[in-house]
A protein has these predicted regions:
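C-terminal transmembrane-helix exit sites in multi-pass transporters
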Residues: 44-56, 84, 100-125, 258-278
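Specific transmembrane alpha-helical segments of multi-pass solute transporters/efflux pumps
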Residues: 13, 17-18, 46-97, 133, ...
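Membrane-interface helix termini and inter-helical loops of multi-pass transporters
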Residues: 19-28, 82-86, 135-154, 205-222, ...
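Transmembrane alpha-helices of multi-pass small-molecule transport proteins
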Residues: 26-75, 101-103, 107-108, 167-172, ...
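Cytoplasmic-side transmembrane-helix entry/capping segments in multi-pass membrane proteins
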Residues: 7, 60-69, 116-129, 183-193
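Helix-helix packing/entry segments at the starts of transmembrane helices
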Residues: 11, 34-36, 92-99, 174-198, ...
Length: 294
């Protein structure tokens, strides 16, 4: 598989998560949706693994795979959704998410001996700046007051949970470089989604989530989430982590908010201004520097 093709496909798929979350919001509570999505992907890839006779890891390794999935998807998405529901503005959550590639790059130095050259760190800085430019209009309107009050209104515990979600996906990304990397991708994705499903179930029970209103939009969003987000995108991301540096792989996430802004413009008629387009260009330049610096 070409690394460039895998990177492009991953970004295109992963960015749709923002759109799916918005589309299914009126029809299902977030963790119920995530439980169905993770469980569906786990079942799908278990069937694929069995049909293709993929080698399953030893039972003693299953716990590691479950933990990897719980960190990479379960805690990350469940905690971030909860933080937004508690009053943390979505734009602030997205800005916190932009720090994840930076955290991964910093931690990859002592853990794996990965070292980004100066151009790579410059690319990371550009990536964060690009995301900030893309999100700037949403953080400032309808008036900076609303967003500022939303951020200020979020409790310290809510902010802590949001930071925990970013720490979770960072840990999950780095953990993919450990012993779990030896497991066949098909069985790894099945087990890791099972781990994420356990977390989503715990969140749904703890928060008393019960809302599920069957609708074509919900079923379409669930099918896309099963096959393309927790399936295809995770396969590509784990492959990129296994076959390259953790910092270079996670730097691709800088492009998710800009692409989501484009998708919001096409699908929902959201405003897309010159500042956001400039942010897209800056983020793209940053990812190019981070990924292909030597």
């Amino acid at each position: 598989m070409s690394a460039l093709l895998a990177a492009a496909a991953f970004v295109a798929l992963w960015s749709t998560g923002f759109i799916v979350a918005r589309a299914i919001h009126p029809y299902a509570d977030p963790n119920l949706y995530l439980l169905a999505r993770f469980g569906g992907t786990a079942l799908l890839f278990a069937i694929i693994a069995l049909a293709s006779r993929a080698r399953w890891p030893a039972r003693r390794e299953w716990g590691r795979q479950l933990l990897a999935g719980a960190l990479l998807q379960g805690v990350y998405l469940g905690a971030s959704y909860w933080a937004v529901a508690q009053g943390l503005p979505a734009g602030v959550m997205a800005l916190l998410g932009a720090l994840q590639p930076l955290a991964t790059a910093v931690l990859a130095v002592p853990l794996f001996g990965e070292r980004l050259p100066a151009r790579g760190w410059s690319g990371m800085a550009l990536g964060v700046a690009g995301v900030a430019l893309v999100l700037a209009p949403k953080l400032a309107a309808p008036g900076a007051t609303a967003t500022a009050h939303g951020a200020a209104g979020a409790s310290a515990f809510t902010v802590l949970v949001a930071v925990l979600s970013i720490a979770s996906i960072t840990a999950g990304s780095l953990y993919q470089k450990s012993a779990v990397a030896r497991t066949d991708l098909r069985t790894a994705v099945a087990l890791q989604n099972a781990g994420a499903a356990l977390v989503a179930a715990a969140f749904a029970l703890a928060l008393g989530e019960t809302h599920w209103q069957p609708a074509p939009t919900l079923w379409l969003g669930l099918a896309w989430g099963i096959a393309m987000l927790s399936g295809g995108a995770i396969v590509l991301f784990v492959w990129l982590l296994r076959h390259g540096g953790a910092a270079r792989a996670t730097s691709l996430m800088f492009l998710a908010p800009p692409l989501a802004a484009l998708q919001g413009y096409w699908l929902f008629g959201e405003t897309l201004g010159a500042l956001q387009l400039a942010g897209f260009a800056v983020a793209l330049a940053g990812v190019a520097l981070a990924r292909w610096s030597r």
